């Protein structure tokens, strides 16, 4: 049996993702996203999906629409 759940990142991977989300950048550019994915041992697609979902969760917690764009878009 695999230690990694089929439906999401492991606790260690989430710790890496959360650190980068909270301390580094909520909107990583493609190069940074690639580096975070490599550090966490996830694909770029999985990492991008996680950041998108986490950003929506953060926006809801701040009372913002979950799908609003940044002011730089």
Swiss-Prot record:
Gene3D superfamilies: Homeodomain-like. Residues 3-62 bind DNA. One of its GO terms (cellular component) is cytoplasm. One of its GO terms (biological process) is regulation of transcription by RNA polymerase II. InterPro entries: HD, Homeodomain-like_sf, HOPX. It is found in: Nucleus; Cytoplasm. Pfam families: Homeodomain. The keyword Repressor applies. Interacts with serum response factor (SRF). Component of a large complex containing histone deacetylases such as HDAC2. Interacts with the acetylated forms of HSPA1A and HSPA1B. Interacts with HSPA8. Atypical homeodomain protein which does not bind DNA and is required to modulate cardiac growth and development. Acts via its interaction with SRF, thereby modulating the expression of SRF-dependent cardiac-specific genes and cardiac development. Prevents SRF-dependent transcription either by inhibiting SRF binding to DNA or by recruiting histone deacetylase (HDAC) proteins that prevent transcription by SRF. Overexpression causes cardiac hypertrophy. Acts as a co-chaperone for HSPA1A and HSPA1B chaperone proteins and assists in chaperone-mediated protein refolding. This is Homeodomain-only protein. It comes from Sus scrofa.
